[in-house]
Every structure is written in structure tokens, then in C-alpha cells.
Amino acid sequence: MDLTALREEYTRHGLTRDDLEDNPFKQFEKWFQQATEAELSEPNAMSLATASAKGEPSIRTVLLKYFDEKGFVFFTNYESRKAQQIEENPHVALLFLWLPLERQVKIQGTATKVSTAESLNYFTSRPRGSQLGAWCSAQSSVISSRKLLEMKFEELKYKFQHGEIPLPSFWGGYRVKPTRFEFWQGRPNRLHDRFSYTLTETDDTTWGIHRLAP
């Protein structure tokens, strides 16, 4: 299939150094709020790239649940492929793509597990069906049929029919602590605006900002 004719011209916005916050977390928050105000579908959806100890890459979409200057937090099964790769190699990358705004944000950093208390706090806020789903799915493992998955869901639904559903020991959150951000704004003629934020060598709170060639 030839896709060479598929082409979009980006004309919505420009991005200059004067537009940027000195703090990349504040810049991300500003863009995220604009994506939310534009009513984009799931603006918190992000691609998460991981790699094994051998350097074998894997990527998938997960949902950002909250962020602050300590990092970006998502939740998953601790026995999943992504969790196994993070255990072997904590260096990860995140990508937010907001096509209607002709923007994307890349974040590189290291992932570490959040505390059990933090995982529990989020788990108890989830809909009951999602809580059961966390118990039900041995994520990334081979299963023989969907029917068995649905049967297990019903069994767990009956088992936990009275009272609160406990936090599974194999489920919880990760916090990605950034070491680099890149903000990309589409521009005409593929002369896009790109700016990177990288931590300086002197401390872990000062960010150097640089324009990058598209």
C-alpha cells in the first residue's frame, strides 16, 4: 500500500522561546490544560516505551493519572511485560500526541514503583468493574479464550460481592521522573518548532532550554 500521498500541512500555531515556561512541568501543564479545553479524546493517553536488559524495545499506550514535579504516574500489573522490562531497565520514554493541536511532548526519565499506600489510594477510586479487572487479568500472559477470562471475572465478582475489593499485591503504580522533555509544534513546510529541556550537570532542579532543528 502506497501512503506517500497522505500529507497534512501544519498551520495552527508557532512556538518561540518567549512562549515557554522556564519550568518544563509548568509548560507541560499549560499544554495539557489547552488539550483538555480543546476537548480532545483522552488527552492523558500516552505512549510508554520500555526496553529489556538486552535492549529489546516495547511500546504501548497507557493513561497518565496524575503528575507534579516529582514525576508522571501511571498504574499497571506488576507482572506485565512493561513491568518486567522496567525491572530490568528503568529508563523509559513517554509520548503525548495531540494531533488536533499539531503538538507532541516527549519525556525521558526513570520509572520507579510508587508506595503501596499511593497505589491503594488510586485503586479505591476506580470503578468496581475496573478493580475486578485488575484481579482478573494476568496481563501479557497467554490465555486460551475470552470465555475463560469472563468466567474468572464472574467468579471474582461473586467472591468480592460483599465489602471492598482489596488491592492486588501484583498491581500498582509507577512514577516516571523526567531527565529530558521535548515540546514539538507542527509548522508549515515541515519547519517544525522543537524545544528541549535537559537537566544541567550542576544540579537536578535547573533546566537548560534549547531550540532543536526540525
UniProtKB/Swiss-Prot annotation:
GTP-binding keyword on record: no
Residues annotated as binding substrate are R7, E8, E9, Y10, K65, Y122, R126, S130, R190, L191, H192
InterPro entries, sorted: Pyridox_Oxase, Pyridox_Oxase_CS, Pyridox_Oxase_N, Pyridoxamine_oxidase_dimer_C, Split_barrel_FMN-bd
Cofactor comment text: Binds 1 FMN per subunit.
The UniProt record gives the binding positions of FMN as: 60-65, 75-76, 81-82, 104, 139-140, 184, 194
Instruction: State its Enzyme Commission number(s).
Output: 1.4.3.5
Please give the subunit comment from the record: Homodimer.
- Protein's name according to its UniProt entry: Pyridoxine/pyridoxamine 5'-phosphate oxidase
